[in-house]
Amino acid sequence: MASEDPSVSGVSGRYATALFELARDEKVIDAVKADLDKFSAMLVESPELLRLVRSPVFGAEAQTKALGAVLDKAGIAGISANFLKLLAANRRLFVVADVIGAYRALVARFKGEATADVTVAETLSDKNLEALKLALKSVTGKDVTLNINVDPAIIGGLVVKLGSRMVDSSIRTKLNSIKHAMKEAG
């Protein structure tokens, strides 16, 4: 299963696949995804937690103990908590973001959905988000979940990555193309 999707490979893919298969067998795929999404948001919001996850200074025992306290406080329990503690015990907590991404990809594939990473210059309105979802659904034939990243550096337009395909209609890219064309011409 892991070899079918490039986003589900390596160490993180193996861990995500094992978690997905366990969650599927226990019929808790969505609950585990919700827990992982909550943990992912916690990583973004807490520099201390991110340091705990990434730093090689903390030993496996210290990471596991600290992580257990964080998970208890966050209300993350069961398979999700045990899995995250296993990553800490095995000194693999630093790949947790990749594991979460791979797990999301496995869930999407299982549900017949696709996930698109969309980079925009400014936040899209709900109307524009729905229009983009419908446009991508017409291309893929699948329900599409959007991961929106706001990057003002693209100036305008958007960059869409869907599986191995990428469409870059950003103003930054268009300006760079014009710049290169002018250099070659002049």
From Swiss-Prot:
Query: What domain of life is recorded for the organism?
Result: Bacteria
Q: Which PROSITE patterns match?
A: ATPASE_DELTA
**Where do the TM regions start and end?**
none
Keyword Nucleus listed: no
The record, for InterPro entries, names: ATP_synth_OSCP/delta_N_sf (IPR026015), ATPase_OSCP/d_CS (IPR020781), ATPase_OSCP/dsu (IPR000711)
Q: Which UniProt keywords apply?
A: ATP synthesis, Cell inner membrane, Cell membrane, CF(1), Hydrogen ion transport, Ion transport, Membrane, Transport
Q: Where does the protein end up?
A: Cell inner membrane
Gene Ontology cellular-component terms for this entry are: plasma membrane; proton-transporting ATP synthase complex
Major localisation: membrane
Determine if Cell membrane is one of this entry's keywords: yes
Give the record's membrane topology.
Peripheral membrane protein
GO: which molecular function terms?
Answer: proton-transporting ATP synthase activity, rotational mechanism
Self-association state and partner proteins as the record states? F-type ATPases have 2 components, F(1) - the catalytic core - and F(0) - the membrane proton channel. F(1) has five subunits: alpha(3), beta(3), gamma(1), delta(1), epsilon(1). CF(0) has four main subunits: a(1), b(1), b'(1) and c(10-14). The alpha and beta chains form an alternating ring which encloses part of the gamma chain. F(1) is attached to F(0) by a central stalk formed by the gamma and epsilon chains, while a peripheral stalk is formed by the delta, b and b' chains.
Q: Which family is this sequence assigned to?
A: Belongs to the ATPase delta chain family.
Q: State what this protein does.
A: F(1)F(0) ATP synthase produces ATP from ADP in the presence of a proton or sodium gradient. F-type ATPases consist of two structural domains, F(1) containing the extramembraneous catalytic core and F(0) containing the membrane proton channel, linked together by a central stalk and a peripheral stalk. During catalysis, ATP synthesis in the catalytic domain of F(1) is coupled via a rotary mechanism of the central stalk subunits to proton translocation.
What HAMAP family does the record tag this protein with? ATP_synth_delta_bact
Q: Know the name of this protein?
A: ATP synthase subunit delta
- The organism encoding this protein is Rhodopseudomonas palustris (strain BisB5)
